[in-house]
Amino acid sequence: MKRVTEKDLENIVTRINRMTGNPEMAYVRNAEGKLEPQAGNYHLSFAYGGVTLHQMCDEGTGTHDVLRCGYVSKRELQSLLFAFIDGIQVEVKKD
């Protein structure tokens, strides 16, 4: 079985951001050079030897664990991300 890398997961998250019309970067620099959070952005979060999918809150004041799985292995998160994409595609087909 091929190793799941951080780059693999980043590519999947980029796909999710594009599918949902959300910003691809979690933060961008404004005219004053300060970082501004990008509401709606999906991104990876690493802690406790694992990884999870977070989304920036609407006001850019924090994040939440989208999949509510906590920090899991890269392989497990890859499976969860593919399931998440399947769910997005089902909703798109409904419209």
Language model segments and positions:
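Negatively charged, low-complexity tracts enriched in Asp/Glu with abundant Ser/Thr
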Residues: 1-41, 57-79, 83, 91, ...
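Short beta-strand micro-motifs enriched in acidic
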Residues: 45-47
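Hydrophobic residues embedded in beta-strands of well-ordered beta-sheets
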Residues: 51-52
